[in-house]
């Protein structure tokens, strides 16, 4: 996964921890982890809109409390889609997942499984991460130029590229 793609000297210094928490508890859970382990100097949460009612409020709370946010609206597959050169205009998670599954299988020759621990490796092998970052950032900035401020109104869109870009900057030294 992402950790394995980091240069060896950074694999022990950048901590990537996946935690199960209810969406409403993500910020507090992240802050608790950061307080327990001092190496979490720059805490992030990553989550999808899906059917999260308090999507905007959770993002706002995180920012106010010093937690960075990588969000996807409607789902993480919109970010994955960008690896293959496009960010389609899906408005709901079901359509987004269904269409990404078809694209993924066409591009990789493999079945898409949401919980696949190798997804990052596969996206990088068959797709273009730098292109994905640019596509996602262009979409995000276009929504902002168009006057959209709330992440829930920015669909399809993601800010996961900010996390990936930050990791790349920290490890390309």
Which stretches of residues belong to each language-model region?
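C-terminal accessory helical subdomains adjacent to catalytic cores in phosphodiester-
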Residues: 2-16, 30-44, 49-173
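Short, charge-patterned binding micro-sites
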Residues: 20-26
